[in-house]
Amino acid sequence: MKQKIKIIQTIIFIFFMSFPFYANAMTVEEIIKGRKAMFSENYQNGKKISILLKSKKLEEAKPLMKKISDNYKKLLDYFPENTKEGFKTEALPSIWENKDEFNALMQKASDDMIKLAKAIETAEDLRAVQKELMWSNCTACHSRFRAPH
């Protein structure tokens, strides 16, 4: 009997841990504002990375690339069904209609930032590699999943 209880407790624990606690505990407003803040932070860090790469300050740019990568992973949990509208969201319905595609793009953007941190060590054209591995992901997402502004 004790073993059955432990198994049930374990299943319940795994079930609840499979959902990101912070996203479940937040209000719709907090989720929408949180994702907007992360995207804004990514953009600001992207601009800083451009400046640092232009100045050949590669090592200073790498932590910003890691931060952007981490934000993209976190953003996967910031688009629950109940956050399609409100609080000046610019997210289009296509996010939820094509959730797998959107999630794949967020994961690719995250992975590409890690690739960028490695690629800058040997790249001859830093601007081109940044465009390929960073800005092109922004463009791909905005053109498909963000309202024009």
Which residues fall in each region the model found?
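N-terminal signal peptide c-region/cleavage motif recognized by signal peptidases
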Residues: 18-22
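Boundary of Sec targeting at the N-terminus
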Residues: 24-26
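Sequence context surrounding c-type heme c attachment/ligation sites in exported
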Residues: 28-149
